[in-house]
Amino acid sequence: MITDEAFRQAVKAAIAEHKKDRNIAFTWEGQTYWIKRRLSNGRNQFAKSSVNVQFYTEIARSSIAHTLTGLSPEIVYLDADCMVTRAAGENINHWMRRRDVSEEEKLEILIRTGQALGELHQAGMTHGRPALRDFLYEDGRVTLLDWENMPRWDNKKKRMTMDYLLLLLLLFREPYSEIDYIKALEKGYTGVNGGETRKWARAFLKKHALIGHLAKALDVFHMKDVEAFSRLYRYLAD
């Protein structure tokens, strides 16, 4: 933890300058940091306690993930209203959309992304909503953000399966998605955690085949989320 009073004042100044923002970047002594404030993300306003629950859940789960795997950024400053971490690069979508990044580099980034999720699962943890925007990449290192989601199921196998399916689904949703990219993501994961989770994911989709067939039938309407699920179903279950 950073206990320097000058750092605390820099945090307060950044918040004062961006009063309405939940996530704030600022620079101190040449290093970029991110402040995450105890504010609503706008998605769960109906739940009165959700702001506090999300904030304290994130502190706890992020700290555990950092201790077990190093995949979560270290919390360097903490008070009752915010947490601060060091910046850890740009998210995966940023790298995949850059034209100056080679195909080989993009494949390697996705392999590392899959490895990161596999390492997390190997450590006995799951993420809950592994969106591509929550995976940061810098100099070969992947960092995971947004740990505010409480696990929905006690069954670890089910949680791992949902993590796996969600990550693939969100990649299928992107305009840049290609089968080589999907396979790179899977290669990274299975290289660390084996192929069991993929088998569970395939079995889960087959169990809900009606939804998969419905999504395929709706392809003609070009609805982004439905098309992404249809592609996922065709890839894993057909």
Predicted segment positions?
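ATP-binding glycine-rich loop module of kinase domains
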Residues: 12-56
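Conserved structural core of kinase catalytic domains
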Residues: 39, 51-55, 73-110
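Short helix/strand-bridging catalytic loops that position acidic/His residues to coordinate divalent metals
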Residues: 47, 98-102, 148-156
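Conserved kinase catalytic-core helix
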Residues: 58-71, 96-133, 138, 142
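C-lobe/activation-segment region of protein kinase-like
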Residues: 147-238
